[in-house]
A protein has these predicted regions:
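Flexible glycine/proline-enriched surface loops and loop-helix/loop-strand junctions
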Residues: 15-17, 87-94, 126-128, 137-138, ...
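Metal-dependent peptidase/peptidase-like ectodomains
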Residues: 43, 53-153, 158
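Alpha-helical metal-binding/catalytic segments enriched in His/Glu/Asp
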Residues: 5, 9-60, 206
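Surface-exposed helix-capping loop/turn segments at secondary-structure junctions
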Residues: 41-43, 116-121, 211-222
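Extracytoplasmic/secreted envelope proteins and their assembly/folding machinery
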Residues: 6, 10, 29, 33-36, ...
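Solvent-exposed, acidic/flexible segments
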Residues: 6, 21-29, 56-60, 98, ...
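Short beta-strand-to-loop junctions in surface cap/lid or active-site-entrance loops
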Residues: 1-3
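His/Asp/Glu-rich mid-to-C-terminal helical/loop segments that flank catalytic regions of hydrolases
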Residues: 160-242
């Protein structure tokens, strides 16, 4: 798109020393590159800025720096920031977003997923520290959120196990990110077909969202508030830094 309004789409390309970062976060970067290639000749409602951030694992340094360099005009012209982090391993595929009306990226993604029969859900709110539909500030969406920019966030994990904070990715092996198991060989052996399925679905979803997201055409209906159904289950602890 050539609009003065923009959507920032980002994924961090660094990883921790353990493993090789196949899930966290080569998977996110791969989907960003795929969607950028698909959309490069397609007209979109807004201009799209694709970014690979560095140093996420050491305090969100790349995204913090980028956000700190944005002018007031840049901030005003940014419709949303969409973050992709750790898409390959988790038992379930999720989309999160800002609370209330600013959660339009999440809401559109869920509507799109329902229409296309894609297996995408959102955080059900089992842990009251992370209300339904939202997530924590542990990834590259956080610096933009602090600027008041609405966010969307794609991730694969499992919010219904462990401490109910989205940190325990799988029932079979717990968390894979930040461990020596975060390699393509391990993931494909233990979860055959999951990488291909997840990255394909996330690519389709993100492409459709970026092609169709237009706030002028998506103004909320009067006197109706979209609510995300919360699940009911006790929780233990809150999620630590990702």
């Amino acid at each position: 798109g050539k609009s003065s309004k923009q959507i920032i789409v980002g994924a961090h390309y660094d990883s921790v020393a353990a493993g090789r970062g196949a899930d966290d976060n080569a998977s996110g970067v791969g989907v960003v590159l795929e969607v950028a290639e698909v959309l490069k000749k397609i007209k979109t409602p807004y201009s799209i800025v694709f970014i690979a951030f560095g140093a996420e694992e050491v305090g969100l340094q790349g995204s913090n720096y980028y956000a700190s360099q944005m002018t007031d005009a840049d901030i005003d012209n940014t419709v949303a920031m969409i973050n992709l982090d750790s898409l390959a391993v988790g038992d379930q595929m999720y989309v999160y977003g800002s609370p209330g009306e600013d959660g339009f990226v999440r809401d559109l993604a869920l509507e799109t997923a329902a229409k296309k029969k894609l297996k995408i859900e959102t955080n059900g709110g089992l842990n009251p520290d992370y209300p339904a539909g939202t997530t924590g500030d542990w990834s590259d969406h956080a610096p933009f959120k602090r600027l008041g920019i609405p966010y969307g966030y794609l991730e694969a994990t499992n919010w219904e196990i462990g401490d109910l904070d989205g940190y325990t990715q799988t029932e079979k092996h717990g968390g894979v990110w930040h461990t020596r198991n975060d390699t393509l060989e391990f993931i494909e052996t233990e979860f055959p077909g999951r990488v291909q399925e997840h990255l394909s679905i996330f690519s389709i979803l993100l492409t459709d969202v970026l092609k169709s997201l237009d706030l002028e055409k998506q103004k909320p209906k009067p006197k109706k508030e979209k609510k995300i159904k919360e699940k009911t289950k006790p929780y233990d602890k809150v999620r630590g830094e990702k």
